[in-house]
Amino acid sequence: MGAYKYMQELWRKKQSDVMRFLLRVRCWQYRQLSALHRAPRPTRPDKARRLGYKAKQGYVIYRVRVRRGGRKRPVPKGATYGKPVHHGVNQLKFARSLQSVAEERAGRHCGGLRVLNSYWVGEDSTYKFFEVILIDTFHKAIRRNPDTQWITKAVHKHREMRGLTSAGKKSRGLGKGHKFHLTIGGSRRAPWRRRNTLQLRRYR
């Protein structure tokens, strides 16, 4: 086994004494820093490389702190107006994961970079911490490499805002396997439209 395989196994056993101590110390360290800051290198190089990171020019890592918990409806004094069934303010759950929220914040802050992917690095009772991989699409090392040219195209601008990253697709219910049957056809709306469209086919 290579070194990265051993690192992967270490991160899988998060309840081991070593990892519990490391994660506690790191969470304390991350809490002292700002909510969004650049990391000098990936905390989990094995995970970052599996998600497409390379230790070369044009790749940037940002660490994002996201507050845990549900999403309160942003209404003044709890006045939602309308019918009582829609009066909920506090116990609402956001449709997207905190990881996709972290990607969005990193993408907003670094408007000139493209979000490639992200991964979990720690959490405590109040916050979750994610590291986001961003790519500088104007760097020659990215533009001249056939493997990374795809992300330089304009269609991939702010892909994190449109649910095109891995975390975003998961929240949209897109994927393979028995967990993702509701989105056969590309979206939640596609199978509904297919089932509810009357097709009177003419046979010759």
UniProtKB/Swiss-Prot annotation:
Matching SUPFAM superfamilies, A to Z? Ribosomal proteins S24e, L23 and L15e
Basic residues compositional bias: what residue ranges? 169-180
The protein's UniProt keywords, in alphabetical order, are: Cytoplasm, Ribonucleoprotein, Ribosomal protein
Give its localization.
Answer: Cytoplasm
Which GO cellular component terms, listed alphabetically, does the Swiss-Prot or TrEMBL entry include? cytosolic large ribosomal subunit
Q: Does the keyword Cytoplasm apply?
A: yes
Q: Where is this region: Disordered?
A: 161-180
Q: Name one GO biological process term.
A: cytoplasmic translation
| Protein function | Component of the large ribosomal subunit. The ribosome is a large ribonucleoprotein complex responsible for the synthesis of proteins in the cell.
Family of this protein: Belongs to the eukaryotic ribosomal protein eL15 family.
Subunit composition and interactions:
Component of the large ribosomal subunit.
Note the NCBIfam families from the entry: PRK04243.1
Protein known as: Large ribosomal subunit protein eL15
Look up and give the organism this protein is from. Ictalurus punctatus
**Encoding gene per record:** rpl15
